[in-house]
A protein has these predicted regions:
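Short, acidic/small-residue loops that bind anionic groups at enzyme active sites
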Residues: 124-133
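Short, surface-exposed alpha-helical segments at coil->helix boundaries
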Residues: 52-60
């Protein structure tokens, strides 16, 4: 079925639910996982250091959860102007056959409306996407 699942996260509560769901699915089907966090590249050394600390913590949580679930996992941090493009490119470059992501992230959008990143991934990717509400 699925062999390699990409799980984008931003560390939000909804994204964490998508991580949990993606890891459960990966364990069930025997797939490996790549956890990815994409941050927009913004200027300033201090802000960049804060981003590094935040992303390291988020990706460590993904890796630790995968280890506890017995799921092979690698993680990647990408700086990009368009997060959806980085998600799609990573899925393609790494041969992922499923993307599991939250309906929306830190933007605080209503659960009724898909987040802009999720919507753009759904619109432009050729890889199947499982959206977790």
């Amino acid at each position: 079925m699925y062999r390699h699942i990409l799980i984008p996260t931003d560390g939000s509560e909804l994204a964490e639910r998508a991580v949990t769901h993606g890891l459960s699915l990966a364990k069930f089907v025997g797939a490996k996982v790549t956890g990815i966090i994409v941050e927009e590249r913004l200027g300033g050394w201090l802000y960049t250091e804060q981003i590094k600390e935040h992303t390291a913590g988020v990706l460590d949580r993904v890796a630790n959860a995968a280890k506890q679930a017995g799921v092979p996992c690698d993680t990647i941090h990408v700086l990009d102007v368009q997060p959806y493009e980085a998600i799609i490119a990573t899925a393609t470059d790494r041969g992922c056959d499923l993307i599991v992501m939250a309906s929306h992230g830190r933007s605080g959008l209503s659960a009724v409306v898909l987040g802009s990143v999720t919507n753009k991934v759904l619109t432009y990717t050729k890889v199947p996407v499982l959206v977790v509400p």
